[in-house]
């Protein structure tokens, strides 16, 4: 078991080792703890609104036609689970967020009304977060993204810098700014 923990730590270090956003330059990622999850839930809870080109949770990803208003509502259910509901454009999404003690990461899994499935892992990078996401589209195609998630809790703003390979149905880089409506 000890060897598995060491291996997972090494894999996470290699997997999450790249540094992209200015807010995180020079700051390595580290495995998440249950205490990090409690902090993450506090930062994420509430109703959020954004004017965005696309979101990672549905088939709007890669849209370049114009911005859409999206809403995201995160509710802390207990110390182990947060549920989410998102809506905007033509779709809605339901998700669950939890701490995975084996992966030492915060995991969010969601399914949208169009059949898009996404799984994101969040790990701390300094005081902020690094996220890797695997998206499975209804046709079976897979998209991989990574993001920096930057919370400004004092001002109720979360900025997400999303990076992908830029192919159809993905993004090269996109910045989404979410504003907390209420907790």
Predicted regions and their residues:
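Positively charged n-region of N-terminal signal peptides that target proteins for export
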Residues: 1-5
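Bacterial N-terminal signal peptides
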Residues: 7-15
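Boundary at the C-terminal end of the N-terminal hydrophobic targeting segment
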Residues: 17-21
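N-terminal helix-cap/turn-to-beta initiation motif at the start of protein domains
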Residues: 32-49
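Central antiparallel beta-sheet cores of small beta-barrel/beta-sandwich binding domains
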Residues: 50-144
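Beta-rich strand-turn-strand
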Residues: 142-143, 151-153
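Low-complexity, intrinsically disordered Gly/Pro/Thr-rich segments
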Residues: 153-167
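Edge beta-strand at a domain terminus
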Residues: 163-183
């Amino acid at each position: 078991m000890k060897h598995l923990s060491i291996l997972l730590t090494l894999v996470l270090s290699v997997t999450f080792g790249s540094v992209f956003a200015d807010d995180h330059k020079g700051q390595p990622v580290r495995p998440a703890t249950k205490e990090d999850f409690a902090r993450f839930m506090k930062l994420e809870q509430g109703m959020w609104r954004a004017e965005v080109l696309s979101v990672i949770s549905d088939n709007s990803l890669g849209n370049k036609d114009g911005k859409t208003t999206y809403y995201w509502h995160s509710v802390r259910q207990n110390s182990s689970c947060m549920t989410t509901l998102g809506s905007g454009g033509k779709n809605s999404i339901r998700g669950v967020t939890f701490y995975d003690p084996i992966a030492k990461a915060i995991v969010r899994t969601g399914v949208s009304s169009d059949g898009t499935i996404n799984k994101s892992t969040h790990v701390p990078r300094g005081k902020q977060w690094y996220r890797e996401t695997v998206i499975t589209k209804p046709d079976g195609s897979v998209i991989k993204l990574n993001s920096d998630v930057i919370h400004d809790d004092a001002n109720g703003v979360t900025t997400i810098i999303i990076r992908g390979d830029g192919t159809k149905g993905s993004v090269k880089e996109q910045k989404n700014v979410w504003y907390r409506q209420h907790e």
